Each structure stands twice: as structure tokens, then as C-alpha cells.
Amino acid sequence: GISGPDLEKALNKAPELYGTKKRYTCGHFPQSFEYSVVGGWVVTRGAGQNSTYYGKIEDLVVCQTYVTPTGIIETKEFPALATGPDIDEIMMGSEGTFGILTRCTLKVFEYRPENIRRFSFIFKNWQDALNATREIMQGQFGYPSVFRLSDPEETEVAMKQYGIEGTIIDKMLKLKGYKPMQKCLLLGTTEGDADFAALAKKKIKKICKKYHGFYTTGFVTKAWEHGRFSDPYMREDLMDFGILIDTLECSVNWEILPNVHKQVREFCKSRPQTVCMTHLSHFYPQKANLYFIFIGKMNKEEYIEYQKGILDAICKSG
């Protein structure tokens, strides 16, 4: 199948390649974007980093064709269904169990990179940051595209990784009482129509200010964009030294999110010399996806037991 970069290149350069009047984007950018293919996105029911605006892959698929041992399953390009079950929904995420995906049609959107508006904020604590993101998602003024909230431990790593540490921004944060291992980073973008992108960013800034968010401009988001697909490459190098890095996620309602975050982190940190970075992405008005990234030295058996413990903590806390 076609890879993510090849698909985006074809869509972005559609006027030159296909004679269209407009440029397009698929809007789907998973962390594996550089080496994954469209078929892989569909059969694993993937989510991209811009999903809060464009939707996940199940929101982008129009129709599909699968080859099975008993025949071909082919859905049509209908805009909606009046009856169920929805065959597209059943097949997406089946990972080859129900058949082999051979063809699919995806939605595309007009590509308007000139309208992208970047923003980032530092909050004094996790709860203020959660309150702000929840209000933004329930504000009914439209959704951001990239939208990512890091907890205190991940924020400390981000301060170094994105070149914030030691800058004038860092010094101002310290003067204003934003403390290490308490402050949280929110970064994101708005896009689409120019008026919408500007209005959405303005609304987001107003809400973040209400919850004591310190505006750190689009500089941090640009730094994140520079390495947004690079983390998977680090995994293999770390494993050569016996250091394992993995990610587990769960979808959590706003009401129970603080408890799930607290309980799972307590388990993760119960293992000595283990880093546990947590962030929220793929936001919805009712909930968000909580990601736990753990890094530590462990063998295969220890990893399996540790992973099971994290899953148990997720289930018990939520």
C-alpha cells in the first residue's frame, strides 16, 4: 500500500500531479507516519496526532474492499447508513482476522498550511491544565487540530527536549512560581478556514488564561513538530542497552481521569529507576485518551509482569 509520506505528497501536490484546482491533505498523522501505510492504519484502527480536528481513521474511511476465504466483502461510497450493523465499522481494526484489506477510499480535506495557528501554555499544576482542556473541548467553538497535554514528569523532559530550559521563557516561569515536577505543558494547533483558526486560538488562549496558563507562543509547538515522528526510532537503540520503552493507553471520562492518572503512575513509579511520562491526546467533549510511556531496564519476563500490572491498575482505577 501507499505510505503516509507518499500519500501526503500526492495530495499536497495534486495540482501539479493531477491537474486539480486545490491542494489536499488526509489529515491522518500517526507517530508511525513515516513508515506506515494506509492499509495498516485501517486494519489497526489507528489514530493520528491531528485526530481531535480531523478524526481517527474510522472517521476518514469512506469504503473498503476485503478478500476473505469465502469471498469478497466490498462496501460502497454512501455518505451515511439508515440501518446497521455498519460493515465498515466491523472490519476496521480487525487486523486481518476477518479478511485482507485490498482497497479503501479515504476522505480528504483542502490543504491550507498558511492558516495553521500554533500555541502552547504552561500551567501551574495538573488539575488546572485538565480543567482548561475540558472547557476547551466543551466550548462548542470548534476543536483544535494537534492538542497534547503533558503531565509534570513528561513536561520536565519536554522542557529539555524542546529547548525551553534556560531560555527567557524558563526564567519567567520560575519568577512566576511555576515549579518543577508540578507544572504542565499544553501545546497544539488550530487550522482550516483562516477565520476559524484565528477564532479558535483566541478562545483557547482566553480559557487557558482563566486557569493560570502562561502563554509560551508557538515556539514550543514548532519544536515538537520537528521531532514528532522520531520517538519510535529511539526504542531500538535503547533496547540494545537493555532499556525498554513502551506505551499503554486508555480512554477515560473527565470525572475519573485524575484518579486513573494518579493510581497508574503510583504503580509505574513503584518500580525503582523507572521513568513514567504521561500525556493526553485524542480529545473529546466527554473524555480524552491517557497515554503512559514507561522507560526502564528490565528483561522480557519482568516486562510482561510490569505491563500486566499497569493494565490491572488502569482497570481498577477506572
Language-model segment annotations:
Residues 2-148:
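FAD-binding subdomain of flavoenzyme oxidoreductases
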